[in-house]
Structures are given as C-alpha cells and as structure tokens.
C-alpha cells in the first residue's frame, strides 16, 4: 500500500513539479500486527525508493504517530479541534475503527481495533461519540476486562516471578535485594511493563530503606500515589 502511494507521489512530482509529503496515521499499536506499520519498514522503503528513483528526494513520509498510540492521536485531535473551533465529538462521531461493523454501521466494540479505541477514550476521560452495538458502559467494561486478561498473559510470559508479583499484585520485594536499590549509575528508569519513563538518576537518593527511593517523578510518569499507613 505504501509503495503504491509512494509511486503515485513520484508521478505528482514529475507532473506538477512540487514536493510531496505523504501523511499516514500509523501508530505503535499497529507495530506488532502489521509489518508495514513499523518504523524500520518506512526507513527501508524511503531508502530503497531514493536509490532507485529520480527526484525521490522530493517525497517524504510524514508519520506523526509512529511512536505514539491512539491516546496520542485523540489528544492531538482534541487540541486541533480547539485550535480551529470545531466540535471534537461531531468529528469523531463520523469515524469508525471497527473492521466488522453491523449492517447499520455500528461497531461491535469487541475487535482489537475497537478495544484500543475505547480504552484511548477512557484514558482521556471521554465517552466515544460513535454508536456501538451495545451500550458504552458495556463495551467499556468489556474492553477493560480484555485488556487486563491480555496484559496478564503477556506479563506472565515476559516477567520473572518477583517482577510479576510486584507489578501485577502490589507485592514488595525484600529490602536490599532488588536489582536497583543500590544503583548509582546515571540514567533513566522505565516501567518494565508499559515502558513509560518514571524517574531519572538525578531524582534518586539514598533513603537507607533498602529500596530505590526517588524524591520526585517524571512529569509524564502518571504515577498514582497511595499513602501507606
């Protein structure tokens, strides 16, 4: 698909004598499913076309969400709608994510793409304006359940026992035993599950408790603090 678009873009360059930018909405949620949505694919495609075609330097891919997700897309859309004075809900009520809508054009809310969309709206505290086969409350609860079930299976595969218990069941590793409790190298700390940046070494201090201690967190860490009494 991208190759066809690129070839057509080259024909526009030749005919109109203009530079062409190809904008695509591929995002990180597509990487595992679609090989042609991965960053390395577009890097390779651009490189190959530039070697094999005249004036291919006048064609570029614009992939603003290649490292983002559907939350990133919706958040960007909300800001853009505010900037140009249009109603976000009206715009998105005219979109559809599902690959299997019913005869009335309603999404089931159960496909992978549906669930990603539903959870993105939830993350931003919004209700999806499109009509689903079932109520919003029901499709939302199903999406939350499926996500938890999928993530639990994934983390059981990927994490060792103590990592799984700490991240999924709120367990605590014994003090002075963890991999990073006495870590002194400069660097950044990321969540082993979701990959979000949580802390940097500049935030770390020696509390003497036997666990890694930080006096603050990254501004995008989204950590929920719970008072321990």
Task: Locate the predicted segments by residue.
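Nucleotide-activated chemistry modules centered on ATP-dependent adenylation/adenylyltransferase
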Residues: 1-146
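A short Gly-Trp-Pro
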Residues: 147-229
């Amino acid at each position: 698909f991208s190759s066809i678009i690129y070839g057509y873009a080259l024909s526009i360059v030749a005919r109109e004598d203009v530079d062409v930018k190809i904008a695509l909405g591929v995002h990180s949620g597509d990487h595992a499913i679609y090989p042609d949505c991965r960053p390395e694919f577009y890097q390779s495609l651009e490189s190959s076309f530039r070697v094999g075609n005249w004036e291919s330097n006048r064609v570029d891919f614009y992939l603003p969400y290649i490292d983002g997700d559907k939350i990133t897309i919706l958040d960007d859309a909300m800001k853009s709608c505010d900037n140009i004075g249009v109603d976000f809900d009206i715009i998105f009520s005219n979109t559809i994510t599902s690959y299997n809508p019913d005869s009335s054009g309603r999404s089931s809310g159960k496909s992978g793409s549906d669930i990603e969309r539903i959870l993105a709206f939830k993350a931003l505290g919004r209700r999806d304006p499109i009509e689903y086969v079932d109520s919003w409350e029901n499709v939302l609860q199903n999406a939350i359940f499926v996500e938890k079930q999928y993530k639990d299976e994934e983390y059981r595969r990927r994490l060792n026992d103590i990592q799984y218990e700490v991240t999924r069941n709120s367990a605590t590793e014994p003090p002075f035993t963890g991999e990073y409790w006495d870590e002194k190298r400069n660097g950044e700390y990321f969540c082993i599950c979701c990959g979000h940046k949580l802390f940097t070494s500049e935030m770390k201090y020696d509390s003497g408790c036997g666990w890694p201690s930080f006096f603050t967190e990254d501004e995008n860490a989204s950590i929920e603090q719970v008072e321990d009494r």
